[in-house]
Amino acid sequence: MAKDIVILGIETSCDETAAGVVKNGKEVLSNVIYSQINVHKKYGGVVPEIASRKHIEAISFVVEEALNEAKLSLDEVDAIAATYGPGLVGPLLVGLSYGKALAYAKGKPFIGVNHIDGHIAANYIGGNLTPPFVCLVASGGHSHIVYVKDYGEYEVMGKTLDDAAGEAFDKVARALGLGYPGGPAIEKAAKLGNMEAIEFPKSFMEEGNFDFSFSGVKTAVLNYLNRQKQKGEEVNIYDVAASFQRNIVEVLVKKLVEAARFKNVSKVSIAGGVASNGFLRQKLEEDAKKFGLSVYYPEKIYCTDNGAMIAAAAYYDFVKGKFSGMDLNAIPYLKIGESDC
């Protein structure tokens, strides 16, 4: 019987200090997340310098807690992995440096993981999804449609050319006075509104174009709010939230389903913070069913940034013998499919 492979994964690319221990790429032994949301909320977004300092304060405790929950010592871990990009350079350096230091001190293999690869790998946790499939990765910093040929082998079919989906959620939520983070705030408000109330524009909707542009709909919402204010008319923020959410979700789902049909695959998945949106999941299930597509998505705890997804992604590098050197540096604008290991 093959030996179990246990990997410690560390994630600090933005404002979550996270560590998780995963066995064989699927079984989560622990997943500890220290969120900085309450710290950044008053600024309406993540402040990189503050995020870096908070990561430094929390990283050792979070890693120790992850090992304790897994009931393992560092000596019992087969490899250590950490995100090295994309993300904010200061936060990335905290987790990357800590992970490399642990690996060096214990003589363990080290694996640098692409953050987007981690989000895709979250779909493997506790489930039976196997490549090939098409995955939508949508979060505050990323919006990609990725054809997953095999574990760790990708073709980017489309990406955002300006604002990411989650970024648009944050900016519109701020304009509506709904607070930060915008995704959950918009989703909550949308449940009280009429999604057909306002028709906002959609970009790049022609067939075969899998790229995104969300700056247009964001600007359209801001212009609508300004016009209503100038006319002295009351704004129904719930209708605006619902109409905006419908716009974003319809674009995401249309392009994902179309990309899957283009690649002639029978499976689609979603990942990233936006993947926890209930309306997105509902709409995808409905549209995918029309074309006989199976839908997969991670548990919501694995949609946000977490260490378990980094450990899961690293497992597939481990079995291929693909390790990183101690000279691996943070790459803030790392693209999926690129490797600097």
UniProtKB/Swiss-Prot annotation:
**Cofactor binding: number and manner:** Binds 1 Fe(2+) ion per subunit.
Q: Which cofactor does it need?
A: Fe(2+)
Give one GO molecular function term: N(6)-L-threonylcarbamoyladenine synthase activity
Enzyme Commission numbers on file = 2.3.1.234
Describe the reaction catalysed, as an equation.
L-threonylcarbamoyladenylate + adenosine(37) in tRNA = N(6)-L-threonylcarbamoyladenosine(37) in tRNA + AMP + H(+)
Q: Where would you find this protein in the cell?
A: Cytoplasm
Q: Which residues bind substrate?
A: V137, A138, S139, G140, G141, D170, G183, N277
Q: Locate the residues binding Fe cation.
A: H115, H119, D305
- One Pfam family cited in the UniProt record for this chain: TsaD
Q: Name one GO cellular component term.
A: cytoplasm
Keywords from UniProt, A to Z, are:
Acyltransferase, Cytoplasm, Iron, Metal-binding, Transferase, tRNA processing
Secreted: is it a keyword of this entry?
no
Q: Does the keyword Nucleotide-binding apply?
A: no
Q: Which InterPro entries match?
A: ATPase_NBD (IPR043129), Gcp-like_dom (IPR000905), KAE1/TsaD (IPR017861), TsaD (IPR022450)
Q: Name one GO biological process term.
A: tRNA threonylcarbamoyladenosine modification
Q: Which family does it belong to?
A: Belongs to the KAE1 / TsaD family.
Describe the task this protein carries out: Required for the formation of a threonylcarbamoyl group on adenosine at position 37 (t(6)A37) in tRNAs that read codons beginning with adenine. Is involved in the transfer of the threonylcarbamoyl moiety of threonylcarbamoyl-AMP (TC-AMP) to the N6 group of A37, together with TsaE and TsaB. TsaD likely plays a direct catalytic role in this reaction.
Tell me what this protein is called.
tRNA N6-adenosine threonylcarbamoyltransferase
